[in-house]
Amino acid sequence: MRPIINVSGTMTALGASIIVPEAISAMAEIASQWVEMDDLQRAASTVVARLTGGEAGFITACCASGITMAIAGAMTGTSLLAIERLPDDTGDLKSEVVIQLGHIVNYGAPIDQSIRVAGAKVVPAGTVSVTQDYHVREAINERTAAGLYVVAHHTVQYGMLSLEEFCEICHAKGVPVIVDAASEYDLRGFLARGADVVIYSGHKFLSGPTSGIVTGRKDLVRAAYLQNRGVARAMKVGKESIAGTMAALEAWEKRDHAGIRRREEAALNLWKDALQGLPGILAKIIPDPTANPLDRLQIFVSPESRFTAAGLASALAAGSPPIIVRNHEVERGHFFLDPCNLHPGEAEIVAERLRAVLTAKDRPADAMKAARKDSSGVLKWPD
């Protein structure tokens, strides 16, 4: 196992987060204790509700499981028999979920699979680049259990209905709205804007253990929680993750956000200065696409650098320690550096490596490689 420098972000494939000390302590403290899990989740509900403005909440294994549980809950309500019969036997249940086509993303797995695991049918609304109000309105019928709205940099960032518009249409037809806000900093805004249930990550910006946070209307949260007696049994969360996430939520309240922001800005400026004047390289500090309070460095790579964006990203990852960049748009000739997950001294290492790789006389063999979606390495695990 090799240590890496993460300038990609809070990615599950890279370990999700650097857990804050408060969460580590809470996890260690509860690890050797017996607890009644429903009571622990009741305590978590109080913390989640206070910080999000929801009526109730609970902790689950991750956001993907939270989506499945919330959708299943919208289908079954509190019918324990219906809960046991999912996902195959939906009977007379409402079992369709409306989602804008531009929101059907892959976050490591396709989001529509999280819907289907609940036993629900995915009903796409609109086109990849445009959703009109009538697309959603006409997709809703007597079988619709919920509308799912995704807030993420992965979604199409133009032409989609706003959350307010989506909620207005769904609510006019008596359909609850579930929001996937895994990476979002705003713990209160989505419920305030009309969502009925919101799902957050406990391990991304909160820096807790791998977990999901479900919050919102009490009846829907209760129905989602009861899925632990059904499809969510395979997604169960441990006491350590519940305690750690509660601690991370409370630590978030007290965190020096202004100080963290200053450190992130210093790293971005350091990297931008390191790239100044290098042939074929243009660096710009840009805001987060979903309006989280953070910036990233976007690095444009042209042939004059004797690299492609994919080739430069590969060269940084090939060093020691590997530097893993945010490369989800690398085929467009650029990638990003995210400053949010650095240990002390790592920003300087990144700056030095960037300069060294780009000023070296020779280039690696794959410097000009094209971006490819190659899954062959995945299929070789664990070799």
Curated annotation (Swiss-Prot):
Keyword annotations from UniProtKB, A to Z: Pyridoxal phosphate
Protein family membership: Belongs to the SelA family.
InterPro entries listed in its UniProt record: PyrdxlP-dep_Trfase, PyrdxlP-dep_Trfase_major, SelA-like
GO MF annotation, one: L-seryl-tRNA(Sec) selenium transferase activity
The name this protein goes by in its record: Uncharacterized protein mlr3804
UniProt-listed SUPFAM superfamilies: PLP-dependent transferases (SSF53383)
Pfam family, any one: SelA
Modified residues (N6-(pyridoxal phosphate)lysine): K204
Cofactor(s) the protein needs: pyridoxal 5'-phosphate
NADP recorded as keyword: no
Superkingdom of origin organism: Bacteria
